[in-house]
Amino acid sequence: MFKKLNKMKIGARLKKSFRQIILIFGILSALVVVIMLYTINNYGTILDNYAYPQGDIAMAMNESAEVRAASRGIVGYDSDSLIESMKEQHEQAVKSFEEYLEKIRPTMITKEGTACMDAIDKAWAEYKEVDAKVIEVGATTDTAKSLQAQRMMTDEAAPKYQALDDALQKLMALNISLGNAERAQLRTIMIAAITIIIIVIAVSTIYSNSLSVAISKSIEKPLNELKDRFITFA
């Protein structure tokens, strides 16, 4: 290639050399931009689908506990005003829990995540059904009915709540696992991309240096020959 370059006139030689160098660094710049865009896009995906939902899952778990606590208060208190207050808390906790579920649902983009959400929906529906029966029986100052409702909470509601909590815990574990896997994959790709960039820079530097040496020699040689002729004629 350098031999072909040496046969060109100096102007054409320099233009071709500069075009080659500009092309190389243009490709390198494009590669860097593509990597940056890929990183930004995938980092955003990790945040939206794994990091942020972990906080929402934790809040959903907290709200489910609030639902159970409010139910216990409803069947445990012997004051009408306190029972009504706990009913309001119960309704708010149910609403908040379901809002968090709907917030989490769109971020479950994997088959495993969808399966976990289906399990949570099933467990929540079953728990709500038993919970409603408990409140229907125990939302009273009647001691006998309150005791009956408390037994229902232990015998019927507790296993349903445990199933709901297990499903939420499984979703959290899955989300953390998938998020870690995505981060590891992104890290691997970034290391590979940086390695490629370093190699391209090194090759470009070596090529540019070789090109400059070849051009300088091709210019220097005829000048030296011309100088020798002048010395001979002198």
Tell me what each language-model feature is.
Residues 11-39, 199-207, 211:
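Extreme N-terminal signal-anchor transmembrane helix of membrane signaling/transducer proteins, especially
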Residues 42-129, 133-160, 180-181:
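Membrane-proximal N-terminal soluble sensing/regulatory segments of transmembrane proteins
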